[in-house]
Amino acid sequence: MTKKLYLPLLMAMVVALFSSCSKKMGELSADYFTVTPQVLEAVGGKVPATINGKFPEKYFNKKAVVEVTPVLKWNGGEAKGQPATFQGEKVEGNDQTISYKMGGSYTMKTSFDYVPEMAKSELYLEFKATIGKKVVTIPAVKIADGVISTSELVNNTLGNANPALGEDAFQRIIKEKHDANIMFLIQQANIRSSELKTAKEFNKEVANVNEAANKKISNIEVSAYASPDGGVSLNTTLAENRENNTTKLLSKDLKKAKIDAPIDAKYTAQDWEGFQELVSKSNIQDKELILRVLSMYQDPAQREQEIKNISSVYKTLADEILPQLRRSRLTLNYEIIGKSDEEIAKLASSNPSELNVEELLYAATLTNDPAKQEAIYTQATKQFPNDYRAFNNLGKLAYQAGNVDKAESYFKKAASVNASPEVNMNLGLISLIKGDKAAAETYFGKAAGTKELGESMGNLYIAQGQYERAVNSFGDSKTNSAALAQILAKDYNKAKNTLANVERPDAYTDYLMAVLGARTNNSSMVTSSLKSAVAKDPSLAKKAATDLEFAKYFTNADFMSIAK
């Protein structure tokens, strides 16, 4: 009897034991998870990842609630992503339900703010599970390595960028002209004595230009006109005679003054163009009607008749407009010849006060020595403190020397004088190199027309993770950043050409060439370029030792002898 009682009890205990075992939720294999990208990569200052996970069949307890959190771990720190929660079939809730019998799949998107320590890190999934009120331990699972941080090199390649120059407006040869008008009475071509004074003053200016050491006469133009009233035949003869008489007088005066200057003479029979210009600038009655007649009719006779039909204004035209068109215009064309490069360079160092602002700024372009350029620009700020360009250009020199704070100080001083597009672009570079992408974008928005803007926007697009857009923005620019964009966009041939032609190559030029070698399976390019990079900047050896771009070279003796 006793045995009969114990046997059912024993069976019940066995069933209960197996039942409790079925509720156990243990360790999950990494095989249940895939991560895109397989090796995490920094993009636009973030480390994004898409995780596809699976709970296997007969794993997820019907009463379980599991919170899954992506955690990126590195030596001395970690960053947690957005968790996702899943529930069993008997749980009342709003989370994704996982079948006990069939299991279930899920997708999680996560992103971490990049910090340099993440260069050598691992991505885990951590689980917080409960079955009813009982806490269940599910071990964390490593699912990916990280982080390829090549895009973050923009913070280094920015030092190789080209700040905008406040350009000089120096012109060695400046073209100038001097005009005078000899006026005629209606239907007359003789030069009146009252107009000889004008001719005399004009000739005096010609003589002054001819005698000046830094001026050279190009030619003298004589343009004679007749007003559009009267027939074409009459006005043609009239204009031609005015041109002949003016040219004769001018030639006589030039010969007397012993001035050899070419004379180019022409005449216009009916000066409709001058008529239209004077009418449009006047306040006469029915001005718009007259201008409409000129636009409607091209035949001179019809134009004249239609305008005469506007009787209310014709007298005003005859008294105020037409007399101004009966003239010969004298134009002296000449060149002002500036100082030679040798003169400017010498004065810049010996007596800069003899130079104007354009000459002084130009002097800085005559040398490639940054120290001499700095001295010239500094002198320019003293002589011309209200000109922003010298301050801006001192900032450019400081930036290219790697002194970002000094550069920013000069750019801000330049902005206080004149917040020009060049200065705004340069302040944008400063913001970008300091990690403030929003401020950089604002500054670049105020830099329209600056020729270096495309390059600067390319740097911004790299920082934002827009690599194709960056490549397009850089165009044919030959800088480290341009090559970086091309590498990130996987245009390796173009990147190689860019790196080979960088104007001011530095350690990062070589480092990028090593990365390019790794991506194109060129081991000799990797080692030779990295060796050159480390020779210029020894700190890059440590970086290369953990840079996942070189992961397959971590067991290469030649590589490790450099990256140590």
Predicted regions and their residues:
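N-terminal targeting segments with Sec-dependent signals, encompassing both cleavable signal peptides
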Residues: 2-513, 517-546, 552, 560-564
